[in-house]
Amino acid sequence: MRRTLVIAVLGLTATSIALGQKQSASRNQRSSVEQAIRQLDNERIQAQIGADVVALDRIYADDFVGVGPSGTVRTKTQVISDFTSGALKFQSITTDEVQIRVYENAAVETGLSTMVGQDKGKAVPRDTRFTRVWVKQQGRWRLVANHYSSQIPQH
């Protein structure tokens, strides 16, 4: 009886340690993914400001779709074309209150964005909320979707 109890306690202890290590590894992995997404988003911002086709092509997934604050829908091809033609240009983009949720091979990024730029000659809405969806494809994180909503002033 005593031997069975000792074996059971040892088994539970080993299981608890293993679960703790797995949760710690999972937390570390999430943190690593969050850092990678933040870095990629910073690269995306710089690529948009500089109309860097190579970086935009690397960051955006081939099936990307984006919805701007005015409701304009753009594919990856349209995004790259609009940046390279000058139809869409930014002088500055900053983000704040960024949160990233990681789900295995997908991540959802939300936050506030302040943009100074023009879309076909018209000023883009300056203050927006955004949602971006990132998916790990062939070992790399790629942006598959984003959506902007104009921020409504609080009363």
Tell where the protein language model's regions lie, with residue ranges.
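A beta-strand edge to alpha-helix "cap/lid" segment located at domain peripheries
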Residues: T4-I7, L19-I59, D63-H155
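Repetitive helical segments and hydrophobic/amphipathic motifs
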Residues: G11-L12
